[in-house]
Amino acid sequence: MAKKVENIVKLQIPAGKATPAPPVGPALGQAGINIMGFTKEFNARTADQAGMIIPVVISVYEDKSFDFVTKTPPAAVLLKKAAGVDKGSGEPNKTKVASVTRAQVQEIAETKMPDLNAANLESAMRMIEGTARSMGFTVTD
């Protein structure tokens, strides 16, 4: 019989840099997870994606065991990296802070495809373009 899920914890942690310090420690401690076990396993699994923020969904079972699924980095993080900026615009409709090409948008959409609710690459690209526009980026050909 399958184990019963008691709790689901969602976090965004820098790849390879999970530590028992806040915010990771308290969130896992409340769920009753072995914090050191999680941090070691997460860091080992994400070591190749250094510098990225990785969303993780942790399923906690009744016997306090856990497993977790790592997702692709958020579109905003990938767009900022592609454009070479630290943050988006405070006024996206007035102030444009950077531009990304359609080729960069396509590359990001291909990376994000497993986590996006999109039927094909074209609709995934439109989602990423919308995120870029809401951050104050222009999308150029």
From Swiss-Prot:
GO terms for biological process: translation. Belongs to the universal ribosomal protein uL11 family. Part of the ribosomal stalk of the 50S ribosomal subunit. Interacts with L10 and the large rRNA to form the base of the stalk. L10 forms an elongated spine to which L12 dimers bind in a sequential fashion forming a multimeric L10(L12)X complex. The gene is rplK. This is Large ribosomal subunit protein uL11. GO terms for molecular function: large ribosomal subunit rRNA binding; structural constituent of ribosome. InterPro entries: Ribosomal_uL11 (IPR000911), Ribosomal_uL11_bac-typ (IPR006519), Ribosomal_uL11_C (IPR020783), Ribosomal_uL11_C_sf (IPR036769), Ribosomal_uL11_CS (IPR020785), Ribosomal_uL11_N (IPR020784), Ribosomal_uL11_N_sf (IPR036796). SUPFAM superfamilies: Ribosomal L11/L12e N-terminal domain (SSF54747), Ribosomal protein L11, C-terminal domain (SSF46906). GO terms for cellular component: cytosolic large ribosomal subunit. One or more lysine residues are methylated. It comes from Streptococcus mutans serotype c (strain ATCC 700610 / UA159). NCBIfam families: L11_bact (TIGR01632). Transmembrane segments: none annotated.
